C-alpha cells in the first residue's frame, strides 16, 4: 500500500504490533509481526517507522498487560519459548532490543505528528516534553512516572492540552491511536485525529510530507479502509 519500493520518499508508520487476539493453542505468536516489521526496516532503511506503544513497552519491561481477558506478556513469552525452545531467551532479548530502539513519535517537516498516544491531562505537570528529542532512559519507561510511559498510556487528552503541546513542539496535526474508534477514524480535537487499524473498520491515512499538513476535516475524508486491500498480514 505504501509502495516503498517505488521511492525512498515513501514512508509507513506502524505501532502496536503485538498481543493480537489470534491465539494458537492458547499461545500468542505475535512475535511474527515484529519479525516481519524488522525485515521491512532492514529492507527499506529510513522508510519503515515502528513506534513504541503500550503493549510493546509492557513486553519489553515485563509488565503484565491484559487484552481480551488474558494476560498477554506471559502468553507472548510462552509463544516464543514454544517455537524457539532453548533459543527462546536469546530471541526474547533480541525482541527487547528491537522494541527499545522504537521512538516515541515521528514528526514530519510539515508538522504532522504521529505517536501511539500522549499523556493524559493529569500527567502534564510531571511530563517532560523533551522526551521526544532525547535518548530514552530507564526512568522514562517507569510506570506512572516516566515520560515515555505517559506517552504510550495516556488517555482523555483535552483540546487545551493539545494546543499546549502543539505550541511546544510546533505541530499542525496529531495522529494518535490507543483509544478505540468504532469507525476506524475520528476527531480527537481541533487538531487531533484518532486512528485504528486493528479491527473490521480499520483505516489508514495517507499524508503528503511535502504539502502543508491537512486539517482534521481533510484527514477524516482522506482515510482509506484497510478492508479494501484484503489481508495484508
Where are these regions (language model features)?
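Feature recognizes metal-dependent phosphohydrolase scaffolds
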Residues: 1-233
